[in-house]
Amino acid sequence: MRKYIAIIIASLALFTGQAHGQRCLPKMQGIEVRADMADGFNLGGKDGGYSFGAALSTYTKKGNKWVFGGEYLLKNNPYKDGKIPVAQFTAEGGYYFKILSDARKIVFVYAGASALAGYESVNWGEKVLHDGSTLHDRDAFIYGGALTLDVECYVADRIALLANLRERCLWGGDTFNFHTQSGAGTNFLIH
């Protein structure tokens, strides 16, 4: 009789539905670390751009999430035989909606909107260029928003790889208002 009970228990354990990790539950938090290319990235070129950022993401009902963080973006603008760096330091607050996920809760696709505010520095505040020309663009406080398409792929219960595509629009500065970013990152779930 014990043998039959053991066989029934083993068969129930093997043939019933699988248990999956509990992900994106309300109030779960994660630390996101990202690296992006900005407006295309030409290795060794004069017009490449990149950004680095970190954020705290807090999940809500239905797998949506709030994201609060900071970002550093550097874009080099070509000028004669050199380049003029434009750096942006921004803080972000936004809400991302889960638009797609698989049944096993491994891959999530989010679409989100964020408010951005920060500071822009043109040529690190130096007005005179290397050839004696005067730069009329100035350092300024900037504000605006961003639209983001974000993909999370869980490789473990507390670690997810990120891929994102983002369009930033910022006003208040003297340089370009729009920046397209694409990149990758990691999300470490802490709670």
Question: Predicted regions span which residues?
Answer:
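Cleavable N-terminal export/targeting peptides
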Residues: 1-28
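Short glycine/proline- and aromatic-enriched beta-strand/turn motifs that initiate or cap beta-hairpins
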Residues: 20-75, 187-191
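Outer-envelope beta-barrel architecture signal
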Residues: 23-31, 62-66, 87, 105-111, ...
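Outer-membrane beta-barrel domain signature
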Residues: 52-53, 70-72, 76-78, 120-121, ...
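Gram-negative (and chloroplast) outer-membrane scaffold detector with strong preference
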Residues: 55-130, 159, 188
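Outer-membrane beta-barrel "beta-signal"
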Residues: 92, 178-191
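Surface-exposed extracellular loop regions of Gram-negative outer-membrane beta-barrel proteins
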Residues: 148-151, 156, 160-163
